[in-house]
Amino acid sequence: MPRVYIGRLSYNVREKDIQRFFSGYGRLLEIDLKNGYGFVEFEDSRDADDAVYELNSKELCGERVIVEHARGPRRDRDGYSYGSRSGGGGYSSRRTSGRDKYGPPVRTEYRLIVENLSSRCSWQDLKDFMRQAGEVTYADAHKERTNEGVIEFRSYSDMKRALDKLDGTEINGRNIRLIEDKPRTSHRRSYSGSRSRSRSRRRSRSRSRRSSRSRSRSISKSRSRSRSRSKGRSRSRSKGRKSRSKSKSKPKSDRGSHSHSRSRSKDKYGKSRSRSRSRSPKENGKGDIKSKSRSRSQSRSHSPLPAPPSKARSMSPPPKRASRSRSRSRSRSRSSSRD
């Protein structure tokens, strides 16, 4: 059956006033009055079309009312129905308690926050009022805070229509304010368990992202540290190799041909032997120079040329032999002078 919505009704309006207002537009099957609005059901759809066309923006009890076709489904609740039980064909009141009989409410993402809501307005009144914009799936009033409610629609177009059309309208003497509750922006209130679950999921995701970021940062730091350590080690090794090559190159110039031939031979004790050899030729060189100069001045035949020694111990005897030759030559010279 065609239903017609009546908006901006006076709070003093009665069923008789509605009946007089729609008189001459066919037979009325049901009148459902709410706080500030109502619904009227016609027997014929053509009568409903004529009433919407003729009576929209007309005055009823001092108020300009809105008359248009109802968009939501018909509800057998909280209304005044026209029935045959009264016998005389009058209006009999029939009220039912609780939520509608269409099952549990369906939660959607197309949610509006209703602010400045009258304390006399229940969630049933809010849901019935919002049905003029589209199909309402969920409604709640004064649950988290007083004077605030929640309304959810089946589609985004219905929510947008309610936001554009019903924002600032009056319910029970108060002009309501509608605010779109976007799922991306975290609102300061949570009206359902699903929303709190989505928040916990977002928090867990953000924590996992932070932990993965910190892990990647620590891994990158450890990698950079290991790289810097490897670089320092390679540099120290290269410096040590350079210093070793320099130390090896210096004894070559002092040793001469013997040190060249000995340094080329590689064995396990090459380092210690090369050091002793590098020290011995220097001492040997000094002893050779002194012995050669002194033996040439005193006696050329008594100064034997020392062979290149293999160890540092063999370097001590040559200076002693030179001193013995000196003493012998001195004693001979003294005896000759005495004679």
From Swiss-Prot:
One Gene Ontology cellular component: nucleus
Tissue spec. comment: Detected in liver and brain (at protein level).
Compartment(s): Nucleus; Nucleus speckle
Post-translational modification: Extensively phosphorylated on serine residues in the RS domain. Phosphorylated by DYRK1A, probably in the RS domain. Phosphorylation by DYRK1A modulates alternative splice site selection and inhibits the expression of MAPT/Tau exon 10.
Compositional bias ranges of the Basic residues kind: 185-250, 321-339
Modified residues (Phosphoserine): S45, S81, S84, S297, S299, S303, S314, S316
The RRM domain, residue ranges: 2-72, 110-183
PROSITE patterns: RRM
GO molecular function: mRNA binding; pre-mRNA binding; RNA binding
UniProt cross-references to InterPro entries, sorted A to Z: Nucleotide-bd_a/b_plait_sf, RBD_domain_sf, RRM2_SRSF4/6, RRM_dom, RRT5_SRSF_SR
Sites of N6-acetyllysine modification: K165
CDD domains: RRM2_SRSF4_like
Amino acid composition bias (Basic and acidic residues), ranges on this chain: 280-291
A single BP term in Gene Ontology: mRNA splice site recognition
Location of region: Disordered: 75-103, 176-339
Alphabetical keyword list: Acetylation, Isopeptide bond, mRNA processing, mRNA splicing, Nucleus, Phosphoprotein, Repeat, Repressor, RNA-binding, Ubl conjugation
Cross-link (Glycyl lysine isopeptide (Lys-Gly) (interchain with G-Cter in SUMO2)): K182
A Pfam family per the record: RRM_1
The family this protein is said to belong to: Belongs to the splicing factor SR family.
Subunit structure: Binds SREK1/SFRS12. Interacts with DYRK1A.
Biological role: Plays a role in constitutive splicing and modulates the selection of alternative splice sites. Plays a role in the alternative splicing of MAPT/Tau exon 10. Binds to alternative exons of TNC pre-mRNA and promotes the expression of alternatively spliced TNC. Plays a role in wound healing and in the regulation of keratinocyte differentiation and proliferation via its role in alternative splicing.
Protein name: Serine/arginine-rich splicing factor 6
Lineage: Eukaryota, Metazoa, Chordata, Craniata, Vertebrata
Gene label: Srsf6
